[in-house]
Amino acid sequence: MNDAFSTAQHRLDALGLRCPEPVMMVRKTVRQMAAGETLLIIADDPATTRDIPSFCEFMDHTLIASETTQTPYHYLIKKGL
């Protein structure tokens, strides 16, 4: 796993959840974070490989890193302003 993931300030376990639940949980968690804070998301739903990058782009957050070659998938996002 990428070392960047170990620096996350928040963590969200979305294992076992299916679309649209992972993105709904990410949205709820990010709302409670301050701008610039980071969130590690761990998921196993294949739809997250599309949904999480799209969510970040749409909501102006930064997808810092992702590992999607095998499950569980890992995403590190930084909350935008």
UniProtKB/Swiss-Prot annotation:
Subcellular location(s) of the protein: Cytoplasm
Active site residues of this protein: C19
PROSITE patterns: UPF0033
Domain of life: Bacteria
GO cellular component assignments: cytoplasm
Protein name: Sulfur carrier protein TusA
Keyword Cytoplasm among record annotations: yes
Family that this chain belongs to: Belongs to the sulfur carrier protein TusA family.
